[in-house]
Amino acid sequence: MKKKTGYSPYPPAIFLMGPTASGKSALALHIARYLPVEIISVDSAQVYRHMNIGTAKPGPEALAATPHHLIDLIDPHEHYSAARFRTDALRTMREIADRGSIPLLAGGTMLYFKTLLEGLSELPSADSDVRAAIEAKARKSGWPAMHQELFRLDSVSAERIKPTDSQRIQRALEVFYLTGKPMSETLRKPKNVSLPYEVVKIALVPGNRQALHQRIACRFEQMLKHGLIDEVRAIRDKFYLSDENPSMRCVGYRQVWMHLENATDALRMREMALAATRQLAKRQLTWLRSMKETREFDCLQENLPEQVKTYLLNTGLKFTEVS
């Protein structure tokens, strides 16, 4: 075993961030070969049980090789929030550090990384009665009308939310109904939060955007071959879901759902899924550019694993290399 000299009073943690199809999961497993890490999934879709193919969850071999956390937490009809992720992640990071291992947080849900680094404003928890009332009103009036109501109550939030984004409209209205204050006002309050870890932030970015798009297309074809359509059909039938459930708004699942509802043919489903995934990757890269003190690596380089290994083992942090 070889120890490196570190100067931070905090235990180390690694953030491995990147757009979809950038190779985060494979790289995380490679890091586990030489550092004593446990992997924490930072993926808002992998929290759902039964959603395996379309979320590219690690398989049995990967799970057996390295401990993974924050996967398969809830059923597809349930809700999961950034606030709950922060609570779950901080608890899990502490447990991993107490075991003498390194928390390696890998994923593409940039909002979750942001909440860990910056904390969350004190928004109220979800209220099932209020949500039910909002949904009932939306069924009668439509979400564009609910967006107009939000504009009247909280114009700042309404300007940031599309009239078709029912999930965010509902949340903004819910916060106003519960607190009597616009959500935008609460979000402006300062957050004094310090993450008690010495974090190494790694960002995987494509040197060639078209090459990433090709990866996205190949991966989606593999998902279809492995039974994504049957997976969505089984989930829909078992849990009596609608397309308003957050789980079914995940990229890929939403487009397959529309196909199963005969709203699109197979070719159009593919086109829509790929377009949505490319847009997701674009948003993820925008988030990454706003991250400070981040070391970028080209995710398309063949020697990426060795580049990252060299970097991690020379950070000066208190890593214990696996012999």
From Swiss-Prot:
What are the protein's UniProt keywords?
ATP-binding, Magnesium, Nucleotide-binding, Transferase, tRNA processing
- Kindly list the positions annotated as binding ATP: G18, P19, T20, A21, S22, G23, K24, S25
Q: Where does substrate bind?
A: T20, A21, S22, G23, K24, S25
Where are the stretches annotated Interaction with substrate tRNA?
Answer: 43-46, 167-171, 249-254
Site positions for Interaction with substrate tRNA, renumbered to this chain?
T109, R131
Q: Is Transferase set as a keyword in this record?
A: yes
Q: Which domain of life is it from?
A: Bacteria
What's any GO biological process attached to this entry? tRNA modification
Q: How does it assemble?
A: Monomer.
- Family as reported in the entry's similarity comment: Belongs to the IPP transferase family.
Cross-referenced PANTHER family? TRNA DIMETHYLALLYLTRANSFERASE
Q: Which NCBIfam families match?
A: miaA
Question: What is this protein's record name?
Answer: tRNA dimethylallyltransferase
Upper classification of the source organism reads: Bacteria, Pseudomonadati, Pseudomonadota, Betaproteobacteria, Nitrosomonadales
